[in-house]
Amino acid sequence: MKLCGFDVGLDRRFFLIAGPCVVESEQLQMDVAGHLKEITAALGIHFIFKSSYDKANRSSGASFRGPGMDKGLEILAKVKKDLQVPILTDVHTESEIPAVSQVVDVLQTPAFLCRQTDFIRAVAQSGRPVNIKKGQFLAPHDMKNVIDKARAAAKEAGLPEDSFMACERGASFGYNNLVSDMRSLSIMRETGAPVVFDATHSVQLPGGNGTSSGGMREMVPVLSRAAVAVGVAGLFMETHPNPPCALSDGPNAVPLKHMKALLETLVALDDVTKKNGFLENDFGV
């Protein structure tokens, strides 16, 4: 698959989608994107900057949602232009898609909406690549149906059918908890779509703090190492210079100062994993 001008797949180094959970300010976006661009370039990692102009799914109605679509897209467009980095953001309704598609390079679908057929069809017909998140309630093999919906919609619109990624972000495990079944990364490869592992939302504790979600950010390195050892096309991580002060998802955000060391480890592991190939592909023979 071609994504933002580069090839992605299990024969390539993982690409990185990263940034603050939500657009807090123009300066924060520029600072984080600039730092991530510098360290990913040094490590030979293709980088896509991520941030949300609106967080439609919040634990409390009083939680910060973001600057809104108009202001948020203005800031994201400035990051894209000034730093020359591709941009990913999530859309929440069909009505948002046309305007957002004019600004960003990649769209993302919220996990809770992966079964919404009309919504999936609409993003698939946007003309942009789409990172489709697997719902916390969905079995990994059921992502084939989601990807097939997107491909069918793209074909109807005369658009490329290979513009979709399948993203794992954990599975519900009782109340206020998620677990990551690493088998899902291998199973979702059967969709034929590049698989992305969301290492930060996978350590979220949804609603675990009452009016906000908790998280175990110390588990991000653990799960991201495991995912890279399994083999993924891409990684997704939210990061912030001061996670305790982040306005959204701070408990599961990677401290920005630790991103370089974490990525160095993951690159070394990725190189070994992909150099040696995937023996499991031969086990069914």
Swiss-Prot record:
Catalytic reaction(s) noted: D-arabinose 5-phosphate + phosphoenolpyruvate + H2O = 3-deoxy-alpha-D-manno-2-octulosonate-8-phosphate + phosphate
One Pfam family linked to the record: DAHP_synth_1
GO MF annotations, alphabetized: 3-deoxy-8-phosphooctulonate synthase activity
GO BP annotation list: keto-3-deoxy-D-manno-octulosonic acid biosynthetic process
Main localization of the protein described in the UniProt heading: cytoplasm
SUPFAM superfamilies: Aldolase
Protein's UniProt name: 2-dehydro-3-deoxyphosphooctonate aldolase
Species of provenance: Delftia acidovorans (strain DSM 14801 / SPH-1)
